[in-house]
Amino acid sequence: MSEPMRSYLDFEKPVAELDSKIDELRALAASGSDIHEEVAKIEEKAVQALNELYATLTPWQKTQVARHPQRPHCVDYIEGLITEFTPLAGDRKFGEDEALIGGFGRFRGESICVIGQEKGSSTETRLKHNFGMARPEGYRKAVRLMDMADRFGIPVLSLVDTAGAYPGIGAEERGQAEAIARSTDACLSLGVPNVAVVIGEGGSGGAIAIATANKVLMLEHAIYSVISPEAASSILWRDGTKAQEAANSMKITAQDLLRFGVIDQILPEPKGGAHRDPAAMIATTGDAIAAAFAELAGLDAGTVRARRRQKFLEIGRKLG
């Protein structure tokens, strides 16, 4: 089975040109031409160009990487890390929301509850999952899952990847703000350890609703903010084209957020981003999740809850 065609971001043009040249030379080599040495030299140049490019990414470029269509999504992490996964559907009040996936399974032999936003990877799946923007029933499903996990003493893992909660009229009529607030409260009130990983976009209350965890991890090129750069640009300058300027001002990168104490750990991505080696990224994430839960193991419910609340109170005091 052939690999999917690689998708390049605008700022990756120099790397795209080198990769294209490599493909041309490999085709010639396959026809009998002895140009292996030349191919090796250009491959070395391409690796160097990629390393230099990704060592100096701007916040706006990181935003583009976080949204890359080939970046591993929630379903990929579940498939790579969770065995015996059994999804649960519906909020028992209105209906099912496929933007938010949740269920129970095993992580390295131990029971776990997994909740995550799924953006989809094709036109069909993006529409099915509403581009990862959950409606009220999605957040109420998350509350239902967290309540079950708490009752049975099962740790909770959140995989965060959303531009934000869905802002449609129907969602607002069904109590979007209340659903987000209750989900956030459920996260904070858990007596079992919970770990959140921002794997792509962490947008606004839609992300926070499942990310108020004992440990918050974030991929190197993910973003986490109260509003998207495009929306901030429209509000601040009445000009949606100034998204790049907004991103550069908003402190949305993992590096900024670690410095502010909003997150606990940055997970390094493969050179060129998680989309260049999804399997390696998923393995790295799995190791970090295991270490985070190991650190929280053995704590009683009161301590787990108190530490989590203190963590977020400290963020408020520090940045408020």
Curated annotation (Swiss-Prot):
Cellular localisation: Cytoplasm
GO annotations of cellular component type: acetyl-CoA carboxylase complex
Keyword Lipid metabolism in annotation: yes
CoA carboxyltransferase C-terminal domain ranges (all copies): 42-295
EC number: 2.1.3.15
InterPro entries assigned: Acetyl_CoA_COase_a_su (IPR001095), ClpP/crotonase-like_dom_sf (IPR029045), COA_CT_C (IPR011763)
GO molecular function terms attached to this record: acetyl-CoA carboxylase activity; ATP binding; carboxyl- or carbamoyltransferase activity
Cystine pairings recorded for this chain: none
Lineage top rank: taxon: Bacteria
Keywords from the named record: ATP-binding, Cytoplasm, Fatty acid biosynthesis, Fatty acid metabolism, Lipid biosynthesis, Lipid metabolism, Nucleotide-binding, Transferase
GO biological process, one term: malonyl-CoA biosynthetic process
Lipid biosynthesis is among the record's keywords: yes
Function: Component of the acetyl coenzyme A carboxylase (ACC) complex. First, biotin carboxylase catalyzes the carboxylation of biotin on its carrier protein (BCCP) and then the CO(2) group is transferred by the carboxyltransferase to acetyl-CoA to form malonyl-CoA.
Subunit structure: Acetyl-CoA carboxylase is a heterohexamer composed of biotin carboxyl carrier protein (AccB), biotin carboxylase (AccC) and two subunits each of ACCase subunit alpha (AccA) and ACCase subunit beta (AccD).
Entry protein name: Acetyl-coenzyme A carboxylase carboxyl transferase subunit alpha
Gene designation per UniProt: accA
